[in-house]
């Protein structure tokens, strides 16, 4: 959504790792933007990243034992199994960080994000620049150019735009491509 989710998460992740914590960055296998590595929108490569199954993230659990900090990037794309994985990691004393969109472009709850938010000790809601009025830190919603598919795809910047509530609720339906 271009709200700096991955960049902000990377900053928190690296802060923990500086203090001798061993960290791992997990991304869903549906994210195929950069094969074998995780790259943020600002083209920063995330060290120690691993792609895991979006459908069955629990299969990665045994591999996570050596890590102190576990990051789930684009958490909205993981199945509901992510909830039991996060609970298990928390019981093991791990620091768990997740980023993702709360809502689809159709304003439906995105994946299991509402459950993850319920378990969060801290929630940071980031906003993007509205693609209609260009107001900074105002866009909280996404809309797809394809009205028949309201789900935002990972890395699909050409498939969707971000919009602030004011522009989204105006009587005139706006599209930055018009």
Describe the function of each predicted region.
Residues 64-78:
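Conserved P-loop NTPase "ATPase switch" module shared by AAA+ and STAND
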Residues 74-89, 104-110:
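Conserved ATPase-coupling elements of RecA-like P-loop NTPase cores
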Residues 132-135, 166:
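Short, cysteine/histidine-rich loop/knuckle motifs that typically chelate Zn2+
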Residues 142-149, 174-178:
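Short cysteine/histidine-rich zinc-coordinating motifs and their immediately flanking basic loops
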């Amino acid at each position: 959504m271009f709200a700096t989710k991955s960049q902000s998460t990377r900053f928190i992740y690296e802060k923990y790792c500086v203090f001798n914590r061993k960290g791992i960055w997990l991304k869903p296998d549906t994210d195929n933007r950069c094969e074998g590595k995780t790259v943020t929108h600002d083209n920063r490569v995330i060290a120690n990243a691993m792609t895991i199954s979006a459908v069955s993230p629990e299969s990665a659990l045994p591999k996570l034992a050596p890590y102190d900090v576990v990051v789930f990037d684009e958490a909205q794309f993981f199945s509901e199994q992510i909830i039991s994985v996060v609970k298990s990691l928390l019981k093991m004393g791990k620091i768990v960080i997740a980023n993702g969109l709360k809502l689809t472009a159709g304003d439906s709850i995105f994946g299991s994000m509402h459950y993850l938010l319920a378990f969060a000790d801290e929630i940071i809601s980031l906003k993007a620049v509205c693609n209609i009025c260009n107001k900074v830190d105002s866009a909280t919603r996404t809309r797809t150019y394809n009205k028949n598919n309201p789900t935002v795809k990972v890395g699909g910047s050409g498939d969707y735009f971000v919009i602030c509530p004011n522009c989204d609720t105006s009587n005139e339906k706006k599209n930055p491509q018009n």
